[in-house]
């Protein structure tokens, strides 16, 4: 994708050895994509093989029509679950909140809240299913534009609270590509290599941030805005 100026947003630590199918079926994400650009968010359609040998391509009209003829009860049950879920406003809100943070526990139920088309629901149920629902043979996803200019910084804060507050403020600007928090114990593991970290308060925190931009000018403007925001914490 790089020659086309695009990239696949999920970026798990195992990216160099991972395959797209494995990333999707495990809902592997990484530091940068969070929940806004993980496998669930970039998925458009899937081609799957069900336990009975049926092949379904959710992005193909003929395949969908054929599946409706051969598996009407299956589709109807999916739609019944959707209707039952969406009628419960309290449950819907709880599901949205649970999946607004990284959540790979069990099978995802978010599609029943976010989609009305049963085939979109089926496709997104595959994310994180680890092969328990069907074999994933093909997937169509969206990609994002590569932003070639990047800046990163390790920020030190006197308290965990101030570090977390700074992350929230920086996130609200929409300028961050990634932010990772380190507590005092994590900082101690690298003190030997970075003596300047020694002597920090016991409640100190650190935040590793990254911001990306299409042009150098845009990157400088982003950095200037972030520096102004962070001056409050200095």
Feature-to-residue mapping (PLM):
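FAD-binding subdomain of flavoenzyme oxidoreductases
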Residues: 2-167
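Terminal amphipathic helices with adjacent charged low-complexity linkers/tails
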Residues: 58, 139, 164, 171-234
